A protein has these predicted regions:
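Outer-membrane beta-barrel "beta-signal"
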Residues: 148, 299-312
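Alpha-helical, heptad-rich or low-complexity scaffold/stalk segments
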Residues: 19-43
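Outer-membrane pore/translocation modules
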Residues: 81-89, 111-242, 252-254, 288, ...
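Long, repeat-rich segments with strong aromatic
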Residues: 234-288, 310
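N-terminal signal peptide c-region/cleavage motif recognized by signal peptidases
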Residues: 14-17
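Sec-dependent signal peptide recognition
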Residues: 2-10
């Protein structure tokens, strides 16, 4: 455990040093030498964000996808007063439809072979942020941050090759306690707790996971608003496929109601970019619950950026 946190600190220090080095690259007068400088440091950063590096050197693994999407456009804003949302006293403050979206997500193993062979206990953390980077009138605030710590027990079936779901063998089963909140106070505070179950099936380049959950009672969302599951759903279905150097994935949530059906759809495509250490990343999302502040507000969003570390 100590080694894992030490590794995380070392990783952050290392990435910061690379950032300073890349800034120095911009001072090189020769275009060819300047490009070579950028390439060398981007390759090093990619290595340090690579899944094997996380696992073998730092004891940390990517959990969900890690990405930065500088161009993220959504079609409509929610009903919150921008002055309240940004804690601003200015009368002409508004929410921009164009913003930056980013997500960091990692998993830190704590114990292995604790109860059964090939089982593990780990801590995971995911943070998704929506930054009004281009909103000068509001001083470029973060519109929303969603914090999601998770404690996971997982049983891996590393030798199982028997097809169960669409000829895909069961590779793991997990039970986790998940807390999700936006870290705000007073009327903008939103958060909920769930007991989650996750079955993951995989073969070759295809991965499918089914994650239903039980919502804990008396959380901030259910206390303040009724029928939360109408918007956030009861499960999440993830599908990922790797083709050559391209990654395709989808995430679906739904309330499974014929009357008043609501849900969420997310489609992702990661593609290689020549001479750049990261993959390009396109994301389209539609529906409810992309963030807690928007969980009752239907949003359509198209984003473009880079993938730092993927689910595979």
């Amino acid at each position: 455990m100590k080694a894992g946190w030490t590794g995380a600190i070392c990783m952050l220090v290392s990435l910061n040093s690379h950032g300073e080095a890349i800034e120095n690259c911009s001072e090189i007068e020769s275009a060819s030498q300047r490009l070579a400088c950028y390439d060398s440091h981007s390759d090093k950063i990619k290595t340090e964000l690579d899944s094997d590096y996380f696992s073998e050197k730092l004891g940390i693994q990517p959990y969900h996808s890690n990405y930065v999407l500088p161009v993220s456009y959504h079609n409509s804003n929610n009903y919150y007063d921008p002055k309240l949302l940004f804690n601003s006293k200015e009368d002409d403050v508004d929410i921009d439809n164009l913003e930056l979206k980013l997500q960091i997500s990692f998993r830190l193993p704590i114990f292995s072979d604790l109860v059964l062979p090939h089982d593990s206990v780990s801590f995971a953390y995911t943070q998704t942020s929506f930054w009004q980077l281009y909103n000068r009138d509001a001083s470029k605030p973060f519109r929303e941050n969603t914090y999601e710590p998770e404690l996971i027990w997982q049983q891996d079936y590393i030798h199982n090759e028997e097809g169960i779901l669409f000829n895909l063998p069961l590779k793991s089963f997990a039970i986790s306690f998940n807390h999700q909140s936006n870290g705000r106070s007073s009327n903008l505070s939103l958060g909920w707790n769930r007991l989650m179950f996750n079955w993951t099936f995989a073969r070759d380049n295809l991965t499918v996971s089914f994650k239903p959950w039980i919502r804990m009672p008396d959380d901030d969302i259910s206390t303040r608003y009724k029928q939360t599951d109408d918007y956030m759903g009861h499960f999440e279905l993830f599908t990922g496929y790797k083709m050559n150097r391209h990654l395709f994935s989808s995430t679906i949530r739904n309330n499974l109601k014929t009357d008043g059906n609501k849900g969420y759809l997310e489609l992702n495509w990661a593609f290689p970019i020549k001479k750049i250490g990261f993959k390009g990343f396109v994301q389209y999302s539609y529906g409810y619950g992309e963030s807690l502040i928007d969980y009752r507000h239907k949003v359509s969003r198209l984003s473009l950026g880079v993938l730092l570390a993927s689910w595979q």
